[in-house]
Amino acid sequence: MDISILWVAIILVISSYFIFMNKWRAAKLPENLPPSPPKLPVIGHLHLLRGGLPQHVLRGITQKYGAVAHLQLGEVYSVVLSSAESTKQAMKVLDPTFADRFDSFGSQIMWYNNNDMIFSRYNDHWRQIRKICVSELLSPKNVRSFGFIRQDEMARLIRVFESSVGVPINASEEISKMSCAIVCRAAFGSVLKDQGLLADLVKEALGMASGFELADLYPSSWLLNLLCFNKYRLRRMRQRLDDILDGFLEEHRVKKSGEFGGEDIIDVLYRMQKDSENKVPITNSGIKGFIFDVFSAGTETSATTIQWALSELMKNPEKLAKAQAEVREKLKGKTNPDVAEVQEIKYPHSVVKETLRLHPPFPLIPRLCKEECEVTGYTIPAKTRILVNVWSIGRDPAYWKDPDTFNPDRFDEVSRDVIGNDFELIPFGAGRRICPGLHFGLANVEVPLAQLLYHFEWKLPQGMTPADMDMSETPGLSGPRKNPLIMVPTIHNPTS
């Protein structure tokens, strides 16, 4: 048989199979589904995602078809929630029904078969690891005790910028190093030897864990599974991750003590691993998954938010001047302000909230509907993938005046906060799966940002204007800048 005829036959057989399966699944769907755009055979609405970041494309779909929209992406049924009302119903009223996560190739490979906290299903394992995390690492007492670590690492960062006065410097890189060091010292008792490599792996992994790989969207296809080249790339990344974490854990076993001279979170996990009364055994893979969680949610999100805040301030010089003036007035003479002092400064606090509104750390929050239910009058079938478009909600003109404009002053009139109570602004999620480290993360954003505004005057590289700034985002589960933020620091002279 001619090889071209063989390939045509294979394609026809595969297409026929998918068409049959799609019709079979469609016949089982309830009638009262959310509105949906016209779709194509085999691929459904997959073609609509081309040419843009998912959160941008999905915003356009929900603007046209309604805040709750139903999509068929390949053979996977998804529902997009893009309003505060629908999100509140899913994450508060029906929270247990929507507390699950769906699997992706990226999360399964890099997060140890979702044997972690971020990507874990809503089960006893998740409850156990979250309880340990909150009680042993993220309690209010512990977060306050980490203040001296922030001061140490902030002093190091200030020295780096002072040594580069008048010279363009990659602020993104230096801020990421600082954020990484703070989290490592707080969680693990010391800075990891390979933390730079680990941070790079986090960025790569988050870019491929969004669930939009073809193999994620056609889970029944062995052929697409076989031809998923990113799967092999992820496995190579996983091997590098194992090498780093196995080495770190071996060093940790033989060390005498950590930063505080006592147990850190890894010691606690090892101790509890030996406890026969655990509902779910704590495995070595689970410990490694937790460490990768800490890097994913702890270091990447804080660094990304500081970079976006500085980017928006550099693009809006009048806002930068206002923030610097207020910080310098309130912190005058205070070389090492604590979290409480910084959070009392109104305008920089509004700058952070406005940054999180425009640039949430995770633009799309993935959930899984456990059982059939109703949201804003529409039926959501069991096992439907849910995409909460936090990015779109933060830019909805129904809730925000001039929504695409960076304007921290809006919070003088709008008393919304970011801790999961106001569903118009949920950068850390909401409900029982809200980010447990949000207060730790906010402290790691607000204190460094205030210090950078206090100590330095900032300029763009020579010949560059605010209008020239590239504000593009990187594709993936998180939303960091596509290109690094380059700035020129000058030491602030209070007498000038």
Swiss-Prot record:
It catalyses: gamma-terpinene + 2 reduced [NADPH--hemoprotein reductase] + 2 O2 = carvacrol + 2 oxidized [NADPH--hemoprotein reductase] + 3 H2O + 2 H(+); (4S)-limonene + reduced [NADPH--hemoprotein reductase] + O2 = (1S,5R)-carveol + oxidized [NADPH--hemoprotein reductase] + H2O + H(+); (4R)-limonene + reduced [NADPH--hemoprotein reductase] + O2 = (1R,5S)-carveol + oxidized [NADPH--hemoprotein reductase] + H2O + H(+); alpha-terpinene + 2 reduced [NADPH--hemoprotein reductase] + 2 O2 = carvacrol + 2 oxidized [NADPH--hemoprotein reductase] + 3 H2O + 2 H(+). InterPro entries: CYP450_71D, Cyt_P450, Cyt_P450_CS, Cyt_P450_E_grp-I, Cyt_P450_sf. It is a single-pass type II membrane protein. One of its GO terms (biological process) is terpenoid biosynthetic process. The keyword Transcription does not apply. It is found in: Membrane. Its EC number is 1.14.14.-, 1.14.14.51, 1.14.14.53. Belongs to the cytochrome P450 family. This is Cytochrome P450 71D181. It comes from Thymus vulgaris (Thyme). The lineage of its organism: Eukaryota, Viridiplantae, Streptophyta, Embryophyta, Tracheophyta.
